[in-house]
């Protein structure tokens, strides 16, 4: 019987190979219906690796061009052009975890480090670079993005030591990118073929700017007098100037393919990075499951190898349930404003000043001498009033607009000042004032055409002026940089919000960080951001959770340098439990509307750039925690075993596995779902002492939401040595039925440390998709 049991899967495998061979013979060398990813679990399994290689050899012997990527370092599998029938057959093969169409992902598109320094009253990594922050370890940050512009001064390697000997990566050459473009700062550069791109020319050089911006935010060398044509002038520097950069170019102007992202994860694991930073993700509506999400799959195997994976939360806010990249082994980052504002005010007749926001470089008069008109009053004959109010494309009459400043409104929620500007400019207008409560706090660059954004409260004054004045006039003032702007931080309107569609029992996002109007390196030849008659700017100011994630990646890199033996979950815990919840007005962090931010907006709070270096206690989420999560989520042991590199020999899914038990994995935040208010719920957490060599005592305090009782036992944790682990229980009960999600926190503290965990309690079921 044992022999039959052993050979049955293998015979089935051979049978399927025969079918595939016949399918391949019929298909010949033609292209398949589409690109599919075949995920076969951990590369540590010899059986999986052999099956993958046999399958590749059989299928693509005469179709080499259809095989796009093979995955063999951190996990097994491949990406290839297949027919739908071939994909179905492969999906039934023993050892195959999933087969799915290659998905497309989108990008989530200086002073910010000084703001974090001010907020936490600590020194950010701003001194001269050395070989390592603590003299013993160089951290290597892998970045999956659009490439890098190596000539930028932000990537000079002055005073940096030799490349770490453990580095196994490479610097791939192209026509415009030579091995000499890599140095002791940029130590690795790889590019990946996009199956949708027929071009034969590939390079790691950044032609978009996004990857260079992200890279310099993380690890850029200090560059004095950096600015965007004089705006945001100062010293541009990365948060971890000692870190090394390894660029994995997975995105081009057409987007980022999942097959390339997985290939980059596979290479990065083999190359030896310490941190992986991804400022990209799926759209909020995609609702991708774990075993068909290349980012979740790649991150799972990276974390198994001790690599922390940090991802942007997405730019689909402010609606709830829009956060992406929410697997529990990923650190998910929201975006907030900083204490710098770019004002471009509107001056009305009578010199009444209306505050506005925008970056432009116009030379219009500072006196209000230009006629002012509302978009609806300038509508073309064929346009609707609503379209004209928004200054939508082809909605305005050129004769009515010429020489005037036009007031436009975001009436549909999907239009932006840049599109209104283009319409006004094309019809001969002098300037554009755009009304939008959401984007008012996020400065965008509008080139040389006068454009500014105001909110509805400010717009009411302009409407009153228009209605009471026969010949209304106005002007738009040049951009002025305002420092020490208050209140800051505030969660950016675009930042995707929780709860996670994956599970409410894991709070997402994890943290928030600066992501609004961030100055960083750019490509050196981008005419689209250049001013007429001036050379291309080497730096650019942009916003997005794309800009927030690299701030966290930089701090994670610093922590890794100071604590090289810490694993990914310890670093994540250090960042989350030391986050701040207050702004520079000493009030609580708010959203773009002024409402107090909840953990669904900001996670544990705003990144603290150096308090996280010494957190006192950490929550270590173990491999078993993640395996149990997969059990609770509904995966069977066979699938989990195929996925895991370090699958314990005696591991089995708990007999009572269910979604509610996800709350029990050792995460730095506490999410309790499916709680209607009846009875009580208990979760357990374990903390590790990393702050003291000797004795340490911590006392708990609880921020309890109204209508609830939260009991923590024990109320004191007494550690006797460094590295000691202690466990506590949190028992939640309610005095009334739960009608909406509520928020609280618990903090373990002593005279030296405060270790805070947010708490979210929901009546909704754990899984919402």
Swiss-Prot record:
InterPro entries in the cross-refs: Peptidase_S8/S53_dom (IPR000209), Peptidase_S8/S53_dom_sf (IPR036852), Peptidase_S8_His-AS (IPR022398), Peptidase_S8_Ser-AS (IPR023828), Peptidase_S8_subtilisin-rel (IPR015500), Peptidases_S8_3 (IPR034197), S8pro/Inhibitor_I9 (IPR010259), S8pro/Inhibitor_I9_sf (IPR037045)
Enzyme Commission number(s) of this protein: 3.4.14.10
Catalytic activity: Release of an N-terminal tripeptide from a polypeptide
SUPFAM superfamilies assigned to the protein according to its UniProt record, in alphabetical order: Subtilisin-like (SSF52743)
Signal peptide: 1-27
Cellular localisation: Secreted, Cell wall
Keyword Signal on entry: yes
Segments forming domain Peptidase S8: 112-613
GO biological process terms held by the UniProt record: negative regulation of defense response to bacterium; negative regulation of stomatal complex development; proteolysis; regulation of stomatal complex development; response to carbon dioxide
Disruption phenotype: Increased stomata number at elevated CO(2) concentration and increased number of epidermal cells.
Tissue expression summary: Expressed in roots, guard cells and meristemoid and pavement cells.
Pfam families given in the database record: fn3_6 (PF17766), Inhibitor_I9 (PF05922), Peptidase_S8 (PF00082)
Gene3D superfamilies in alphabetical order: 2.60.40.2310, 3.50.30.30, Peptidase S8 propeptide/proteinase inhibitor I9 (3.30.70.80), Peptidase S8/S53 domain (3.40.50.200)
Keyword vocabulary terms for this entry: Cell wall, Hydrolase, Protease, Secreted, Serine protease, Signal
Chief localisation class: secreted
A single Gene Ontology CC term: apoplast
Induction: Induced by high CO(2).
Gene Ontology MF annotations: serine-type endopeptidase activity; serine-type peptidase activity; tripeptidyl-peptidase activity
Superkingdom: Eukaryota
Domain Inhibitor I9, residue spans: 35-108
Domain PA: 381-465
Cystine connections: none
Transmembrane segments: none
Family, as annotated: Belongs to the peptidase S8 family.
Function, as annotated: Mediates CO(2)-controlled stomatal development by cleaving peptide EPF2 (AC Q8LC53). Not active on peptides EPF1 (AC Q8S8I4) or stomagen (AC Q9SV72).
Protein name per UniProt: CO(2)-response secreted protease
Organism, as annotated: Arabidopsis thaliana
The encoding gene: CRSP
